[in-house]
Regions:
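N-terminal "mature head" segments of proteins
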Residues: 2-140, 167, 209, 415, ...
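A short beta-strand motif characteristic of beta-propeller blades
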Residues: 54, 65-79, 118-125, 164-174, ...
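Repeated scaffold domains used in trafficking and secretory/extracellular systems
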Residues: 76-90, 125-140, 170-187, 211-224, ...
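Recurrent small/Gly-Pro-centered beta-turn motifs in extracellular repeat architectures
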Residues: 90-99, 144-149, 191-194, 228-229, ...
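Structural motif
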Residues: 102-110, 150-157, 195-201, 230-237, ...
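Non-cytosolic head/periplasmic domains of membrane-anchored proteins
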Residues: 106-191
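Loop/turn-rich, solvent-exposed surfaces of beta-rich toroidal or solenoidal domains
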Residues: 327-401
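Blade-level signature of beta-propeller repeat domains, shared across WD40, Kelch, NHL, RCC1
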Residues: 404-444
Length: 444
């Protein structure tokens, strides 16, 4: 009987060790479903070719007089040059264009649907002069473009559905001042006052709602953001300034708030336990989802890094562990399907991306390629990245994620206006002279 009892105890202990070290991860991986990946809409197995084509003239910018520079998308090869590619809303892209005329340089807001290359509205003329406007989305319906001469600013508010100017005139917003500085926050425009707070912006580029605080906006995810307020954070909607409190007891404070696409994590300091903080995850309504440990942050929808132990762990928003890895916490991450790519290098010139399959727990072949800010997207196996140095003769490179080998590249003229962007699920190329746009699709 004693021997039998000992065998049972040993089996239970062994089972507990197995569950804590391996079994719980296997169980969690079997239940976990990766969030949808925003794949490119066309195969990238071969070098893509032009699909639809359009020109600055087709977008509505009038032709220049003979002997004058042709109108073009207003890209610049200067380090602090014009931001010609303004923003995207789903498959819609918005660009700043320029044309020359007797009165000087005219600036234009243009838009296209990247699915078919159709013009969203005839180009909207903004200011005339050498000073380029800076444009900001302000929700799904409006674009606000600003010109700041150093002493005052003028605004143009454009209805993105009708393509009409609904307001033009003075605005308290500024581009270069610490007071009421215009700042992009997701798909909205806000005005920030350093150490004072954040304002919303209305249909006449006027100030609307106000939230006092540090003047630094954290996030956002969708239209939800956070702002520091003297040892704590306040959470609010960028659409209307509505504030809400996450699902925590009174007296709780927040620190190190970090957003992903469907929620946020925060270091939570419960009243009376300020020296024993814990990181928890929340959805975008402030509802608590799970506990991550003493240190953690989001990496993708519903996916977090827990860095509280000697190893780092990939966990779900509920705190279920999918993977444990020895070594330094990731310098960057990218989720493609069920594979998490982890940059193990802190040298931007020498990236080292190690893939982990979160369904099997297996390590893949590491790649010394750029999957950070220059990454444009993938069809599932081929990753495409932009080449952003205007002086070189390439505009894009593509790599096989299975072998890490480059499979194709796209040439351009050095020091030209050629660029490549992603709009929705489509890669869009600007011609070397800046006058034409085309989609990039798989060859027939």
């Amino acid at each position: 009987m004693l021997a039998t009892a000992l065998v049972v105890v040993v089996a239970l202990v062994a089972g507990g060790i197995w569950w804590n070290s391996i079994g719980s991860e296997m169980w969690a991986r079997a239940r976990w479903q990766p969030p949808p990946t925003a794949y490119l809409g066309s195969s990238m197995q071969q070098a893509p070719v032009p699909g639809w084509r359009t020109s600055v003239n087709v977008l509505g910018v009038p032709s220049s007089p003979p002997g004058v520079e042709a109108p073009r998308i207003a890209v610049s090869n200067k380090q602090d040059g014009t931001h010609a590619f303004i923003d995207t809303l789903e498959n819609r892209g918005y660009f700043l264009a320029r044309s020359a005329g007797p009165s000087g340089t005219s600036w234009w807001l243009t838009g296209l649907d990247a699915t078919q290359g159709h013009t969203l509205f005839p180009a909207v003329q903004l200011n005339i002069g050498e000073r380029a406007p800076e444009c900001f989305l302000n929700g799904p319906d409006a674009m606000v473009c600003l010109v700041d001469d150093g002493s005052a600013a003028t605004a143009w508010v454009v209805d993105l559905h009708a393509g009409t100017v609904t307001y033009t005139g003075p605005t308290p917003l500024r581009l270069f001042s610490a007071k009421l500085r215009a700042e992009r926050a997701g798909d909205y425009l806000v005005a920030v006052m350093e150490k004072e707070g954040v304002y919303g912006v209305g249909p006449k580029a006027e100030l609307t709602w106000f939230i006092p605080g540090s003047g630094a906006v954290w996030g956002p995810a969708k239209d939800i953001a956070a702002q520091g307020t003297g040892g704590n954070y306040v959470f609010f909607s960028l659409a209307d300034g509505h504030m809400f409190t996450p699902d925590v007891p009174d007296g709780t404070a927040f620190d190190e708030v970090r957003f992903n696409v469907d929620g946020f994590s925060a270091r939570v300091l419960y009243d009376g336990e300020r020296f024993n903080p814990i990181v928890e995850s929340f959805d975008l309504t402030g509802k608590k989802i799970g506990t991550l440990g003493r240190d953690g942050y989001p990496v993708a929808a519903g996916l977090y890094i827990d860095a509280s132990a000697s190893d780092w762990r990939v966990v779900t928003a509920e705190g279920s562990r999918l993977l444990s890895v020895e070594g330094h916490i990731p310098y960057d991450t990218l989720l493609i399907g069920s594979t998490l790519y982890v940059n193990e290098s802190n040298n931007a010139q020498m990236p080292y991306w190690q893939p982990y399959d979160l369904k099997s727990g297996e390590k893949g072949k590491p790649c010394e390629i750029e999957l950070g800010e220059k990454y444009l997207g993938t069809d599932g196996t081929i990753a495409v990245r932009a080449v952003t140095n205007p002086q070189v003769d390439l505009i894009a490179k593509a790599f096989d994620l299975r072998t890490c080998e480059m499979v194709w590249s796209l040439p351009k003229e050095p020091n030209s206006f050629g660029r490549i962007w992603r709009i929705g699920d489509t890669l869009v190329r600007l011609s070397d002279d800046g006058t034409e746009l085309n989609s990039l699709v798989a060859p027939d």
